[in-house]
Amino acid sequence: MSDQEAKPSAEDLGDKKEGEYIKLKVIGQDSSEIHFKVKMTTHLKKLKESYCQRQGVPMNSLRFLFEGQRITDNHTPKELGMEEEDVIEVYQEQTGGHSTV
């Protein structure tokens, strides 16, 4: 009945095997681009770790933003509504904010 009507919407994503993966661009402050192919259900912690490893910097020294929203380790592309060729911006983490005069 109504339960059966609600099911197809959840299954629609599984119909296309190509839809399981998307390509994302990660752009650093120096305008360097690294492209990643990730599953829609993969935690973005993996992408962040891979990016930091390639750049040779600790993960806690950078922050990753998608459409102005900070990406947490547990976010997935699906949760954030990411699509093919979307851009993730990377910035140097800044702490503090007051002078030490």
Curated annotation (Swiss-Prot):
Alphabetized UniProt keyword annotations: Cell membrane, Cytoplasm, Isopeptide bond, Membrane, Nucleus, Ubl conjugation pathway
GO MF assignments: protein tag activity; transcription factor binding; ubiquitin-like protein ligase binding
Self-association state and partner proteins as the record states: Interacts with SAE2, UBE2I, RANBP2, PIAS1 and PIAS2. Covalently attached to a number of proteins.
Name under which the protein is recorded: Small ubiquitin-related modifier 1
InterPro entries: Rad60/SUMO-like_dom, SUMO1_Ubl, Ubiquitin-like_dom, Ubiquitin-like_domsf
Localization (cell): Nucleus membrane; Nucleus speckle; Cytoplasm; Nucleus, PML body
Posttranslational modification: Cleavage of precursor form by a sentrin-specific protease is necessary for function.
Family annotation (Gene3D superfamilies): Phosphatidylinositol 3-kinase Catalytic Subunit, Chain A, domain 1
Ubiquitin-like domain ranges (all copies): 20-97
GO cellular component: cytoplasm; nuclear membrane; nuclear speck; nuclear stress granule; nucleus; plasma membrane; PML body
Transmembrane segments: none
Gene: SUMO1
Family: Belongs to the ubiquitin family. SUMO subfamily.
Record-listed cross-link Glycyl lysine isopeptide (Gly-Lys) (interchain with K-? in acceptor proteins), residues: G97
Domain of life, source organism: Eukaryota
Cross-referenced PROSITE patterns: UBIQUITIN_2 (PS50053)
Annotated propeptide span(s): 98-101
Coiled-coil region list: none
Job of this protein: Ubiquitin-like protein that can be covalently attached to proteins as a monomer or a lysine-linked polymer. Covalent attachment via an isopeptide bond to its substrates requires prior activation by the E1 complex SAE1-SAE2 and linkage to the E2 enzyme UBE2I. This post-translational modification on lysine residues of proteins plays a crucial role in a number of cellular processes such as nuclear transport, DNA replication and repair, mitosis and signal transduction.
A single GO BP: cellular response to cadmium ion
